[in-house]
């Protein structure tokens, strides 16, 4: 929110190129990029659809960085080493859940709305926990580590709320 506008161009070779900013286009790119990154076939992706007017000529692998930074902007926080690194959102499968989450949380009909990719991502990051999509992403991010913490917490709560232990007459006699 420190700037009044969102980015709408990518720099390649020192020159700015206008990009289509609609979330649907970048969702498509995110799906294609994920599939490409998991594949052994490293044929360059056809990304011409990302650009509005002129299409840059890429001469170096580092010139693609602007596209990746636009597609997958990094948030400064939260910073954590505990992330499993697993994907928790799959656009090709989660479309219904994304749609319903935006409708439920924000009253936004994604089929009727033009939305900048970065606005879309900000709203995704801010989805309340009460949406089905948030629950699904929580299931997908489960590592089992939390389970240890929960069992310790519940054990401590159980001990805190149990009535004081009273020795039976037999136990008292056995101690004597």
Task: Go through each PLM region and give its residues.
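Charged interaction scaffolds used for protein-protein
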Residues: 1-18, 24, 34, 42-176
């Amino acid at each position: 929110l420190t700037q009044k506008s969102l980015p709408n161009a990518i720099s390649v070779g020192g020159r700015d190129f206008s990009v289509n900013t609609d979330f649907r286009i970048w969702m498509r790119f995110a799906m294609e990029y994920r599939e490409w990154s998991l594949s052994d076939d490293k044929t360059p992706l056809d990304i011409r659809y990302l650009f509005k007017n002129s299409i840059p000529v890429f001469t170096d692998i580092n010139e693609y960085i602007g596209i990746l930074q636009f597609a997958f902007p990094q948030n400064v926080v939260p910073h954590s080493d505990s992330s499993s690194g697993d994907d928790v959102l799959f656009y090709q499968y989660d479309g219904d859940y994304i749609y319903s989450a935006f409708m439920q949380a924000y009253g936004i009909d994604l089929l009727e709305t033009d939305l900048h990719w970065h606005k879309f991502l900000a709203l995704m990051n801010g989805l309340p926990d009460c949406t089905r999509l948030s629950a699904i992403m929580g299931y997908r991010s489960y590592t089992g580590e939390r389970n240890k913490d929960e069992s310790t917490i519940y054990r401590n709560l159980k001990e805190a709320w149990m009535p004081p232990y009273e020795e039976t007459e037999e136990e008292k006699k056995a101690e004597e």
